């Protein structure tokens, strides 16, 4: 990987994939500078080199310049704040004005605008999958053979397309399905909240599934669909019977533990 010769900036929000990215850099002897987004970055094992508030996010370009960094990667979750709750400095206000037209048009348009700002500043945004190859979802653990009396390949494909169609409205990456229809859709509160809302319904469904895919127009440098042990635990406790996920475009947190739990709880899993 070409970045081995230069320092990499990891711009990190919350979630366990941040630590996976750090470990990958260490294994490959990639020098990195970790920028944690305040109130989102939550890794206690590896404190960030700098903790940057969204109120001062406009300072990020001078920070990168001072560190002589050109290559950057985004990893982890950052909830889009309500603008009325921000107290930005003057430089951040300038960048907010640049993205204002896109702020309320959905995450995809907003993230692409942010991506283009970094490019125009001379930075190269890298695909985090290059660092997390062992975390990319594949079909190695597909277990359809154990559930052939419950679901068919045709139904799997249909549910996958339902999730993609839902994602085309830029409202979320995940849906819960059963009986050839969408029962609930993800909103800005995320996948675990979607599962919680399903649990509150106390439904008795035939074979409800969580389906998670990238959105059709998604910028793949940000916010890839993610599945990990916490979500698997929540799926099981909610009564959902399994997961369909998009292979190659999704990331698995702690694959060993994740698939161990899927097997333990006898959950359906299919990467399509």
For each predicted feature, which ranges?
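N-terminal basic/disordered segments at the start of proteins
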Residues: 3-37
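General beta-strand structural signal in soluble alpha/beta enzymes
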Residues: 10-12, 34-36, 72-75, 125-130, ...
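Conserved mixed alpha/beta catalytic, RNA-binding, or beta-rich assembly cores of soluble enzyme
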Residues: 15-18, 25, 51-54, 104-108, ...
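Short acidic, glycine/serine/threonine-rich loops at helix termini
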Residues: 21, 44-46, 84-87, 137-140, ...
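Feature captures the catalytic cores and cofactor-binding loops of soluble hydro-lyases/lyases
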Residues: 37-69, 86-99, 193-272
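Selective hydrophobic functional segments
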Residues: 70-73, 83
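Short glycine-rich anion-binding loops that position phosphate/pyrophosphate groups of nucleotides
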Residues: 77-80, 215-216
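Ser/Thr/Gly-rich flexible loops in soluble cytosolic domains mediating phosphotransfer, phosphorylation
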Residues: 88-130
